[in-house]
């Protein structure tokens, strides 16, 4: 943020499996000491009582799979096709329509210059694979693809609200920095929905997280656990510790 003179930022990293977002206020990254790992609907998770960057992560990325439930409701994620076999358009045997495939159908991704021209998008396979979903929803393939993108966007909007609106921050006071392989595909739609005035796409955004890790300052946090009885003397004991 300092390099581009932007002190208030909402960051969004959209990869193949997940989307991660965080908030920077006045140049300061938000830190959380109440972080849980492996927390999901089936597990209460495990607390990591260490300072970490306050990140919200959801199962929504370029490889997130679109599916229809028993009530004919369309969903996107959290299941992912991963990188192998990956989206159907990769032509590597993928059998489930993903957000990337939907972006290709709607021409949000150039079908003739897929992955910088390194991969020939298998659009015949994409059309055949999305057809059952479209028939179940009674949509055209393009309508189904647009629905997939809208649901993916809504999932990410909810995540962005968790780091901003839900914590008392107005997104209109921030700029959105989007990176990762899919960040640029969805950033403007998300910013429009949240009234974020500026979208920033870094150079080499697909590897921006890795670059940031290499460029970030080293930091060490020293923590000491002290077990003591909660009584009138506890505060003095903790202060001495």
Residue ranges with predicted function:
Residues 1-241:
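N-terminally biased helix-coil "hinge/interface" segments that flank
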């Amino acid at each position: 943020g300092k390099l581009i003179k932007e002190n208030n930022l909402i960051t969004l990293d959209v990869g193949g499996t997940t989307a991660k977002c965080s908030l920077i206020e006045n140049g300061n990254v938000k830190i959380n000491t109440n972080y849980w790992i492996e927390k999901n609907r089936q597990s209460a998770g495990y607390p990591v009582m260490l300072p970490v960057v306050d990140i919200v992560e959801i199962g929504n990325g370029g490889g997130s799979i679109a599916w229809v439930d028993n009530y004919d409701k369309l969903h996107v994620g959290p299941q992912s096709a991963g990188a192998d076999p990956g989206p159907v358009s990769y032509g590597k045997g993928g059998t489930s329509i993903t957000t990337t495939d939907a972006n290709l159908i709607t021409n949000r991704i150039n079908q003739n210059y897929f992955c910088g021209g390194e991969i020939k998008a298998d659009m015949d396979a994409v059309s055949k694979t999305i057809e059952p979903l479209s028939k179940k929803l009674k949509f055209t393939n393009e309508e189904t693809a647009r629905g997939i993108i809208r649901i993916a966007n809504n999932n990410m909007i909810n995540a962005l609200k968790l780091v901003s609106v839900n914590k008392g921050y107005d997104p209109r006071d921030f700029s959105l920095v989007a990176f990762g392989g899919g960040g640029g595909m969805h950033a403007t739609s998300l910013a429009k929905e949240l009234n974020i005035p500026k979208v920033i796409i870094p150079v080499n955004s697909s590897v921006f997280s890795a670059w940031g890790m290499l460029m970030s300052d080293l930091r060490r946090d020293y923590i000491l656990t002290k077990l003591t009885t909660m009584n009138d003397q506890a505060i003095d004991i903790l202060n001495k510790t």
